[in-house]
Amino acid sequence: MSERLLEVSGLACRRGPALLFESIDFTIEAGTALCVRGANGSGKTTLLRTVCGLTRPDAGEVRWRGAARGEAFRGELLYGGHAPAVKDELSAEENLHAALGLAGAEVPRDRMHAALTDVGLFTRRALPARRLSQGQRRRIALARLILDPAPFWVLDEPLTALDDAAQALLLRTLDAHLARGGAALLATHHDLPLANDRVRQLRLGA
């Protein structure tokens, strides 16, 4: 039986007077992903931010490896928001190096160059991010996924602005992450062609 990593029980969140969701319960085991689906405004991003500890719930509990979230959880978390978290004045390589450094991941330059090659940014690695297209900026985050050893990924619409080749690479990267015992929580409008025993669905606002 796979290790139970994340446990969510009785989670509820409001936006002002409006109830986004309530009584949300789920678990995520090692080697599995949970995809959160729902219409715009149903609370998908709020749910992800609440699990990460970025938004306070109105009710409920989130536990990591059987305990309350703390430094250990933050050290094992990779959060990718809806917008690419890049600094315009830094180059693609500098943004990647900074993101990995903040996560405490020491990655040799040759491995960073290999990841930038995989995502099609090696020849643009020295360009300031402000000169990159939206899709190229998203590829910096994809390079981080290739390199970051964090076991738990929380990704908000990770396929947005990626072309077909980059989407395929992201799915291969996610599949490899799950195969080595990682886990993921994703909000996405896309169907993810992963093995049925690795991915489950949670629909909000149904």
Regions found by a protein language model. Name each.
Residues A83, D88-G104, R111:
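Q-loop/switch helix immediately C-terminal to the Walker
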Residues H97, R109-R124:
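Conserved ABC ATPase "signature" region
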Residues L142, G181:
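Hydrophobic anchor residue at the start of the ABC signature
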Residues W153-E157:
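Catalytic Walker B motif of ABC-type/P-loop ATPase nucleotide-binding domains
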